[in-house]
Amino acid sequence: MTDTRRRVKVYTLNEDRQWDDRGTGHVSSGYVERLKGMSLLVRAESDGSLLLESKINPNTAYQKQQDTLIVWSEAENYDLALSFQEKAGCDEIWEKICQVQGKDPSVDITQDLVDESEEERFDDMSSPGLELPSCELSRLEEIAELVASSLPSPLRREKLALALENEGYIKKLLELFHVCEDLENIEGLHHLYEIIKGIFLLNRTALFEVMFSEECIMDVIGCLEYDPALSQPRKHREFLTKTAKFKEVIPISDPELKQKIHQTYRVQYIQDMVLPTPSVFEENMLSTLHSFIFFNKVEIVGMLQEDEKFLTDLFAQLTDEATDEEKRQELVNFLKEFCAFSQTLQPQNRDAFFKTLSNMGILPALEVILGMDDTQVRSAATDIFSYLVEYNPSMVREFVMQEAQQNDDVSKKLTEQKITSKDILLINLIIEHMICDTDPELGGAVQLMGLLRTLVDPENMLATANKTEKTEFLGFFYKHCMHVLTAPLLANTTEDKPSKDDFQTAQLLALVLELLTFCVEHHTYHIKNYIINKDILRRVLVLMASKHAFLALCALRFKRKIIGLKDEFYNRYIMKSFLFEPVVKAFLNNGSRYNLMNSAIIEMFEFIRVEDIKSLTAHVIENYWKALEDVDYVQTFKGLKLRFEQQRERQDNPKLDSMRSILRNHRYRRDARTLEDEEEMWFNTDEDDMEDGEAVVSPSDKTKNDDDIMDPISKFMERKKLKESEEKEVLLKTNLSGRQSPSFKLSLSSGTKTNLTSQSSTTNLPGSPGSPGSPGSPGSPGSVPKNTSQTAAITTKGGLVGLVDYPDDDEDDDEDEDKEDTLPLSKKAKFDS
């Protein structure tokens, strides 16, 4: 049999009961050996690949809808649809399906939609079709009961639907509706409401086509006004005829398109406003209604796209200066609805839609509209712009860069136009609208900031062999736009505190800082050059003095993001300008309050300590230690001081660092098990042995026991043990009885170096009140044994701690030592033997 090729779109129904477009191709029917039967084949028109191969199963229920649709279920919860470009192609494939199943092609459905039970199947064989009562006023109650009783059974629903179709019953019911309204027969109107609602739940396309026809749809809506659960009927028809006016902003010449728009609006209104909220059971019975609306929308968008005269007139009138304001507002609102309409389409359809709008010049038109004074028009234009950015940010970037290039070319010829040409850049208009938002809650500014963030996000920028969109666009953005974005920040931070500190200004600056923080994270050298050259961080930190905590935290978050990069260019800039001073001032001014500001500042310094950022550690201790040394409810600042002293010690004794490297390299060359064994033996050595300078190594490495290497290592380990004792003593200083409220004074003088290795300092440190076994307790006079000190440290960590407290992990190498000291005796004995 020869194939009949017809152009179709293939759809599948997803979990949300929405149709997904699987592609466009040509359908044919033929025998497929692998499937052992006649099948439907769809090959993609782009590359000829197979989009669909479906055997025409004799028991599958196929439905023909709206003359150009064939819908069926391949398996449970897997629905398919073919949408034909031409009715003739649909008819030919439908005839082929009916031929395989032995059905009359005049039917719209080939099988029952749901498998009925054996009992129902027997009843079907033994009983004739459903007989409807005569359509009379006196029998409305009987009809309503019949419809209600048929809904639970798939077989009875099918019989009822066939009876309603064959007898033209719906139109007769609508005639009775007029009679009931004229007679004010409320009981009859209530019965009609139940009947029409039940017909919707039959989920039958053929019935919908009758109900949604021009002559019937308003009467159907009228029946649904008389809900028995309501004391007064709804006035849906009055709203649709008097309030909801169809404005033809651009004349539509195609009467079929106009009728389709009217029908879709009304059916959507029925679904959203008229029908009661369906139950889960009823929701599944309204899938055909969803499909009806979906395919109508696809058709409308397609017909409008193909009408080039319509779109040309639309954009011409939008940008024409002679167009009056009311007309322009209507045009913009239409375009906004048109774009919103497209969001229901599948990706392929949306691509074609926005490509058409782009070719028609939507972005230049939006630029003109955004420059107008009418706030409503600008708001609608912003919504349209958001659709474009979400759909294809690269398209928007390409436009604004081309625009900037054109302006630069003009400015070379006419220097006086340089400022004007920069001011009219589309992206600068967006930034200005964000900055000038008059809404107290800045709803529009938040939306625009999100769009700008999408545009400057490198994650969605394209990269090709010849050029990189990221490099080109970011170069453009920092040259032409960044000064506009930072203008309100720079204007408000000329002094030591914000010149304007009202709530709306604070909200706006918080938005600007949020975008700048995003840039710090994603833009590397572009934002780095801008921050350092324009001294942006110093201006941002002025906002730490704001009375609005959320703005001060935004400023702190900006600096924290910069420090988190661990970039020495940034670090040198921070140190050169003494940019920790505003942070320390804010910390001291916050006093003894436990709040987010306190925690965030401590976390910043803790990050510097844990990551061992040497330059910042030295800068903080040398310049701010006097102001921070009394903070003892966390160990962060004392830990920073310890880091600083260790750095000094390494600088004073370079051999110490080299010995540590030798030791580490010597150990890392061996496998992990050997390393672990040797660590146990090393750290289980008696202190007396260490004092004598003897090292314990595994027999396998005795040949490597060079006196020139191991003698300095032994000295290093002695010094290391003294430091560990010192650190444990520092831990014991944590106050377990609650947080202190020391008085602070900011001092920028350098702190004096403390000798951390002196024996006297380790034995005279005060202990924590209430800590068992601490140096000051009666049970531990004089020096502290190793196990006692360790117990005290563990108790301190397990007790009550401050809001922000961190484990003291200055030396990564000490972790293994702590573990080894707690080994059971049996394990130690294994290595001592």
UniProtKB/Swiss-Prot annotation:
Question: Per its UniProt entry, which superkingdom is the organism in?
Answer: Eukaryota
Sorted alphabetically, which InterPro entries does this protein's record hold? ARM-type_fold, EVH1_PP4R3, P4R3-like_central_dom, PH-like_dom_sf, PP4R3-like
Keywords of this entry: Acetylation, Cytoplasm, Cytoskeleton, Nucleus, Phosphoprotein
**Region Disordered: start and end of each range?**
683-712, 733-833
Subcellular localization: Cytoplasm; Cytoplasm, Cytoskeleton, Microtubule organizing center, Centrosome; Nucleus
GO BP terms: DNA damage response; gluconeogenesis; positive regulation of gluconeogenesis; regulation of double-strand break repair
Point out residues bearing the modification N6-acetyllysine. Answer: 655
- Annotated coiled-coil positions are none
Task: Spell out the Low complexity composition-biased ranges.
Answer: 752-768
What PANTHER family does the record tag this protein with?
Answer: ATP SYNTHASE GAMMA-RELATED (PTHR23318), SERINE_THREONINE-PROTEIN PHOSPHATASE 4 REGULATORY SUBUNIT 3A (PTHR23318:SF3)
Record-stated family: Belongs to the SMEK family.
Question: Per its record, how is this protein called by name?
Answer: Serine/threonine-protein phosphatase 4 regulatory subunit 3A
What gene is this protein a product of? Answer: PPP4R3A
